[in-house]
Amino acid sequence: MNKRAQSRSAARLAAVQALYQHEMEATPVAQLIHEFHQHRIGAIIEDAEYADADVPFFDDIVKGVLARADEIDAAITARLASGWTMERLDRTMKAILRAGTYELIARGDVPVGAVVSEYVDVAKAFFDGREAGFANGLLDAIGKDVRKK
């Protein structure tokens, strides 16, 4: 994986963490982004080194998800199984799906397959079970919905 791809992968992971924090604590966007810039991205915390991330890409994902939350949640909800709601999803999974859906909607420069693959990898960082497959199927379906030609 080249350096640009690695820094974008790190940005995606950090964005999911930031979105999770926002969901849990309602941290204001400017404060949230500042905290990640200053204390997370590229930092060493409890002997774990956070990779250098593509900071503008991180910012775009976090700000974009929060600015377009209703549109993103509608796209996700449209592909959930009958009887499922956003509220039923694990908060980490919500953050993963929201970030991935934002990229599918707003980042036409990133191929659908790359978005899906990257967020499946993020899901694998947080979950051991079927969740990665769930993220794969949902993001693939959303990609087909939003990138129709």
Curated annotation (Swiss-Prot):
Family: Belongs to the NusB family.
UniProt keyword terms in alphabetical order: RNA-binding, Transcription, Transcription antitermination, Transcription regulation
SUPFAM superfamilies per the UniProt record, alphabetical: NusB-like
Pfam families linked to this entry: NusB (PF01029)
Role, per record: Involved in transcription antitermination. Required for transcription of ribosomal RNA (rRNA) genes. Binds specifically to the boxA antiterminator sequence of the ribosomal RNA (rrn) operons.
Gene Ontology process terms (BP): DNA-templated transcription termination; transcription antitermination
Protein name from the UniProt record: Transcription antitermination protein NusB
Gene Ontology terms: cellular component: cytosol
Lineage: Bacteria, Pseudomonadati, Pseudomonadota, Alphaproteobacteria, Sphingomonadales
GO molecular function: RNA binding
Gene3D superfamilies: NusB-like (1.10.940.10)
